[in-house]
Amino acid sequence: MKLVMLLRPPPQTHRADTTDGLPGLQEEPRGGDGPTCSGPAPAIPDSPSRCLSRGFAGRDPGCHRNRHRVHPYILSGGQRILVTSSSSSTVQGPLSSGSSQHSQSRGRPPSPDSTETERARTPVNSDRQRAGEFDLLKGGCRPCCLIEGNGNKVKCLRFRLKKSHRSRFLDITTTFWATGDEGSDRQGNGTILITFTDTTQRDLFLGSVSIPGELSVRRITISTD
């Protein structure tokens, strides 16, 4: 006869002071586990959780922040995600005095330059007149030349005189014509008037500047009555 012995396993209990059914052995924390919190991290957006999981071993009980800040978020259905962001921050310093002065100066007109102020105070003593201050009868007597002819040729001569012989005369007018009885119809030839400081300058001008033969040159002197 064969005897078969059936061994019954010891009863398992679920007491807190037993491990795997062995009485007298208390459950100890697993090796490498760090401090845990009593409850889950609060699900507050944009606020770092102080204790996230049991995987942060070797930290002090205060669970200080690392260089990375972790923000918990809750999705629909109760699921949680962790979003890690860098702790870098940008510090904006105060505005410099130069930029503030620049913003203030845009609201007021610029002050005149010292050279411009001095130039406005200085009277014109030379016989040479400034631009916009042409005076045909300055001094009571002015030697001049009238050059008449075809309008286009007179204009070309005036352009050449201003470009190449500017130091040989005082002032020169634009090309002008006489007008008719009605409207602005031009009559006669185109004319320019050239003024000089004295008769000597006029003689030097006429002796050194070539004038086309089809243009007529008249020496005149303008004076007041």
Swiss-Prot record:
Name any GO cellular component annotation: host cell nucleus
Principal subcellular localisation of the protein:
host cell
What the entry lists under SUPFAM superfamilies is as follows:
Viral DNA-binding domain
Domain of life of the organism in this record?
Viruses
Q: Name one GO biological process term.
A: regulation of DNA replication
Localisation per UniProt entry: Host nucleus
Q: Which residues cross the membrane?
A: none
Question: Where is composition skewed (Basic and acidic residues) in this entry?
Answer: 116-128
UniProt keyword Signal, yes or no: no
Where are the annotated segments for Disordered? 1-67, 85-128
* Keyword Cell wall biogenesis/degradation attributed: no
> One Pfam family this chain carries?
PPV_E2_C
Low complexity bias locations: 92-108
Database matches in InterPro entries: E2/EBNA1_C_sf, Nucleotide-bd_a/b_plait_sf, Papillomavirus_E2_C
Give the UniProt family note: Belongs to the papillomaviridae E8^E2C protein family.
Q: What is this protein called?
A: Protein E8^E2C
